[in-house]
Amino acid sequence: MTNLRQLVQFAKTEPARIFFISLLAITLSTADQSLFSYAIPGLLEEFEIDLNIIGYMLSASFFVASFAVVFVGMLSDYIGRRLVLVTLLGLSALFVGLHAFADTLLVLTILRVSGFALGAGLYLVASTMVVETAPQKYRGLVAGTLQIGYPFGFAIASLIVVPLIDTYGWRSIFLPAFIVLLISPLIAYVLPESSTFKNLQQTSGDENAKGLSDSLRELLSDHKPHLFICFAGSFLISLAIGGTTYFL
């Protein structure tokens, strides 16, 4: 009962608001990004390509995203989590929505790569905000619960796709992404900045003056085993999800 009361009290706090809004952002972004997988049969037919070309497009998306998330992480340390998260949500939704109007395979590839890279960065920032503001006792719980947004986003996308794609074709399924673009200013209004980031901004010189090379050196020297274990786990999970989502 004590733990239950503590959870109820937590639900009324600013960290809880950050958690629920971040969960919404991840769900919406995942729904947007997953639309591409449903469009693949239509793409193969309209552009008269085989699955190898789709594989190259997806590989390019993941490759660019792997570098984009590093840049996004650095950017969020300098200008704030809130601004970066909302900007990524809006821009990724815009690029996904524009899939509906792509008239060439090159344009479609550029939109896919750009939208996916921005969406990948959003997951990073949302997770960071939630973990660094959650009470230490419940960080594992809220971090795990946040992952609900990924399968839930896919579920929402499937409900949207089924009635649209049969009637209006593959292009129509990307149009709901513009709704997410319209929602992003509202999310910006209600989402508070991470208190941890605000506290870091108030600290003096030495910490804030660290460059990228200094930060990476410190990370590799102090947290190398954890870093590589987490990287390997993330890599293998992404390998499995990517293969089963897009090619089975």
Region locations from a protein language model:
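Extracytoplasmic
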Residues: 17-51, 244-248
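Extracytoplasmic gate region of multi-pass secondary transporters
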Residues: 36-37, 224-248
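Residue-level signature of mid-helix packing/kink "hotspots" within the transmembrane helices
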Residues: 34, 62-70, 155
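Cytoplasmic helix-loop-helix junction between adjacent transmembrane helices
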Residues: 111-148
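Conserved MFS/SLC helix-loop-helix module at the cytosolic interface between two early adjacent transmembrane helices
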Residues: 67-103
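Helix-breaking motifs and short loop linkers at transmembrane-helix boundaries and internal kinks
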Residues: 48, 80, 101-107, 118, ...
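Helix-loop-helix hairpin linking two adjacent transmembrane segments in secondary transporters
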Residues: 146-189
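Paired small-residue
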Residues: 95, 106-114
